[in-house]
Structure formats: structure tokens, C-alpha cells
From Swiss-Prot:
Transmembrane segments: 29-49
Superkingdom, taxonomy of origin: Eukaryota
Species this protein is from: Plasmopara viticola (Downy mildew of grapevine)
Task of the protein: Secreted effector that completely suppresses the host cell death induced by cell death-inducing proteins.
Record protein name field: Secreted RxLR effector protein 160
Keywords associated with the record: Membrane, Secreted, Signal, Transmembrane, Transmembrane helix, Virulence
GO cellular component term, pick one: host cell
Signal is among the record's keywords: yes
């Protein structure tokens, strides 16, 4: 339609307007040339601009050019890099969470140990000349028979001390050890898988660097958000 209207305008100018302008301004040839150029500008500019607009429209609404392998590869890389950034953020938050939990547990254990009463250390038993074990009950009965009316307080205290069971020291909770989580790529079955994982990590590093360069507009190697 645009080309038909342009052709109609050009034919009208060539067959009618051109001779009328020449008859009206026959004494001023410069004015005639100027008017002719003004009438010819639409006939030249409209086809050129229409061709350019049609080409851009075809490229914009063409779906086939979106199926190029390079475009798909770039989109997949961006998606994997975005997923990698989310994974790294999750790992960092999990490490901070685990460290806070370990520190809080250590502080609680130390506080519980300080609040508990200190247990006296058991005295080392004296060596006996005989290897036969001495029955504390028999010793107490013999001392009672020796003094039927009055018990020796020293002997009684020694017997009671031997009868009573020495309380065992409370076990002190061992200090909790914290190990950072290992990467799922830490264990390799074959050297080929190890090389493949190294290649994959290098590709992810390059993709993350590419995305970071998009944020780092001013070149300060940092971004606020």
C-alpha cells in the first residue's frame, strides 16, 4: 500500500505538477528546481524507509532466529550461573548458621560446666601387704566385737569411708568439633570425572564472573546489592 501511494504521488507529479510549476515560475529557474526537489523527496524517502521498516519488522517478529544454537547456549549458561549464585548463597548462609549453632552450644556447655559443683578427686587406695581383698563389713564387725560398749570413732570413720562408694566424676562434655561441609564434587570415582568436574567448575566460575561484570558497571570490583 505504501509503495502504491508513493507511485501514485510520483506519477501525479511527473504528469501534472511538474509542468504546472514550470509554467508558473518560468522566469525563476531556481525556484522551479527547489519545488521539484521538494516534491521528489517523498518519492525517494518513502520507499527507502518503508524497506528498512519492513526488514526490521520481519526480524523482530521472526521466531526462527530465536532458535539459534548460540542463543540457547547463552540462555542456558545464564540460567546455570543464576542457579550457581543461589547455591553459593545458600552454602554461605548454611556455614554461618552452623558456626553460630556451634558457638552457642559451646557457650552453653561451658556455662553448664561452670555451674556444676566441683567433685572432689578420689584418694588413692593404700597398698596392702596381702593380695587377699579385705571385706569392709568383716572389718566393721570385728571392730564392733572388740568394743562392745564403745566404738572407736577413728575406726568407725575409716570403715564407713571404705564402705561408701566414691562418686564417679561427672564426664565433661567434649568440645564440639565443627567441620565445614564438603563439596559434593570432593569425592571422585575416576580421574575422568575429576577432570570433568574441574572443567564444570571453571565454566561456572567464568559465567559468574561474566554476570558480576554486568553488575560492576563502575569497575570498583564491588556492588551494593
Amino acid at each position: 500500500m505504501v509503495f502504491l501511494l508513493t507511485a501514485l504521488h510520483l506519477s501525479t507529479f511527473l504528469l501534472r505538477e511538474m509542468y504546472q510549476i514550470a509554467d508558473i515560475f518560468e522566469d525563476h529557474f531556481a525556484i522551479v528546481l527547489f519545488l521539484w526537489s521538494l516534491f521528489l523527496i517523498p518519492s525517494v524517502a518513502v520507499p527507502f524507509m518503508s524497506t528498512r521498516i519492513a526488514r526490521d519488522g520481519l526480524l523482530a517478529f521472526n521466531v526462527e532466529h530465536m532458535k539459534v544454537a548460540q542463543v540457547i547456549v547463552q540462555v542456558s549458561r545464564l540460567l546455570r550461573a543464576r542457579q550457581t549464585l543461589r547455591t553459593l548463597r545458600f552454602v554461605a548462609e548454611m556455614k554461618i548458621h552452623l558456626r553460630e549453632n556451634v558457638r552457642r552450644n559451646n557457650e552453653q556447655v561451658m556455662l553448664n560446666v561452670e555451674e556444676k559443683p566441683q567433685v572432689p578427686l578420689p584418694q588413692a587406695p593404700r597398698r596392702r601387704s596381702s593380695i587377699i581383698p579385705i571385706d569392709a563389713t568383716a572389718t566393721f564387725k570385728a571392730a564392733r566385737r572388740r568394743s562392745s560398749t564403745h566404738l572407736d570413732p577413728l575406726v568407725t570413720a575409716g570403715v564407713l569411708r571404705s564402705i561408701q562408694q566414691t562418686p564417679l566424676p561427672l564426664p565433661v562434655a567434649s568440645k564440639a568439633t565443627f567441620e565445614p561441609p564438603l563439596s559434593p564434587l570432593a569425592a571422585y570415582l575416576t580421574p575422568r570425572k575429576q577432570r570433568g568436574d574441574a572443567y564444570r567448575r571453571e565454566m561456572e566460575r567464568r559465567e559468574i564472573h561474566t554476570i558480576f561484570c554486568l553488575f560492576d558497571v563502575d569497575g570498583s570490583v564491588c556492588y551494593s546489592q
